């Protein structure tokens, strides 16, 4: 998902999506360790999405503190 689309979402939605992605990352790492992972590139995509969401949440937090 693009950063622009993520910025339009509410923080509660972003937190839910963040939790889902963390769960998915855990599952992917488990599959990697057991040799069942079909697409190792998915780990990179999920980690990037997690970083984007965390960055947007932090930006909103700092914006709220300034006001």
Swiss-Prot record:
Domain of life: Bacteria
Key words of the record: Ribonucleoprotein, Ribosomal protein
GO BP of this protein: translation
Gene Ontology terms for molecular function: structural constituent of ribosome
PROSITE patterns: RIBOSOMAL_L29 (PS00579)
GO cellular component: cytosolic large ribosomal subunit
Bilayer-spanning residue ranges: none
InterPro entries referenced in this protein's UniProt entry, alphabetically: Ribosomal_protein_uL29, Ribosomal_uL29, Ribosomal_uL29_CS, Ribosomal_uL29_sf
Listed Pfam families: Ribosomal_L29 (PF00831)
UniProt similarity note: Belongs to the universal ribosomal protein uL29 family.
Official protein name in the record: Large ribosomal subunit protein uL29
Species annotation: Clostridium acetobutylicum (strain ATCC 824 / DSM 792 / JCM 1419 / IAM 19013 / LMG 5710 / NBRC 13948 / NRRL B-527 / VKM B-1787 / 2291 / W)
